[in-house]
């Protein structure tokens, strides 16, 4: 069998509201995922064992890596004895809140389900994905905007794309999601806005006023401890973004722009200071 190569795209969060904490310690949330044009490249080759290599030497390639965990979880589910050599060309910054590791894991499930002739159902793959992480189901099942709730297991593809251009900045800090959940300023007693309805107004009527309720609950604690992240958000606004926010638990931030030309110009200017990536309006994962 020949090798298979794929791209694994990153995401941003339009709003990230932490709604509670379960008895098992997991936090529940509501968010809207949107894809961006920042991707890793993965190559899957037949092998006797499950193993991995990566262009970024700071990333482990052992059982703690989500790709390895995804491959072994699928193998355990199916009972196959096949192996795979995974080659990861890492471009999405890690510890940035862009879901790079989750996207890589979703690509691993999708490719190996075919390569190993498992033909697991979408329901079975969803269960495996939920066990790997809150963002993994999104990358497995959606190409555009999607609403997620619970611990990520409640996922609804909104069948929409964002009609605005995006500039994403990585300030350089690597922020642990575990740290962010331990330290964010909890406020569970509040009314949660209808993110699904509001994002439809945003996309279908270009009603940008709805964005005022698209808060990210990690922003206050991240900005307090990582001032460079706040500065990056401010830089986006100064460059013409009409809405800017932290993505996930950071440290990446993103800004929305009215058109591609303004966004491209801002990305080029900001690339002198940050790792910057432009995403055109109405982008969807291939």
Curated annotation (Swiss-Prot):
Please list the coiled coil stretches: none
InterPro entries referenced in this protein's UniProt entry, alphabetically: GHMP_kinase_C_dom (IPR013750), GHMP_kinase_C_sf (IPR036554), GHMP_kinase_N_dom (IPR006204), IspE (IPR004424), Ribosomal_Su5_D2-typ_SF (IPR020568), Ribsml_uS5_D2-typ_fold_subgr (IPR014721)
Q: What is this protein called?
A: 4-diphosphocytidyl-2-C-methyl-D-erythritol kinase
Family classification: Belongs to the GHMP kinase family. IspE subfamily.
Provide this UniProt record's keywords sorted from A to Z.
ATP-binding, Isoprene biosynthesis, Kinase, Nucleotide-binding, Transferase
Q: What Gene3D superfamilies is this protein classified in?
A: 3.30.230.10, GHMP kinase, C-terminal domain
The UniProt annotation places ATP binding at 93-103
Any one GO MF term held by the record is: ATP binding
**Catalyzed reactions:** 4-CDP-2-C-methyl-D-erythritol + ATP = 4-CDP-2-C-methyl-D-erythritol 2-phosphate + ADP + H(+)
One GO biological process term is: terpenoid biosynthetic process
Does the entry annotate any disulfide bonds, and if so which pairs? none
Task: List membrane-spanning regions.
Answer: none
Name the source organism: Prosthecochloris aestuarii (strain DSM 271 / SK 413)
Q: Which HAMAP family match?
A: IspE
Q: What does this protein do?
A: Catalyzes the phosphorylation of the position 2 hydroxy group of 4-diphosphocytidyl-2C-methyl-D-erythritol.
Q: Which residues form the active site?
A: 11, 135
| Biological or metabolic pathway of the protein | Isoprenoid biosynthesis; isopentenyl diphosphate biosynthesis via DXP pathway; isopentenyl diphosphate from 1-deoxy-D-xylulose 5-phosphate: step 3/6
- PANTHER family reported for this sequence: 4-DIPHOSPHOCYTIDYL-2-C-METHYL-D-ERYTHRITOL KINASE, CHLOROPLASTIC (PTHR43527:SF2)
What Enzyme Commission number(s) apply to this enzyme? Answer: 2.7.1.148
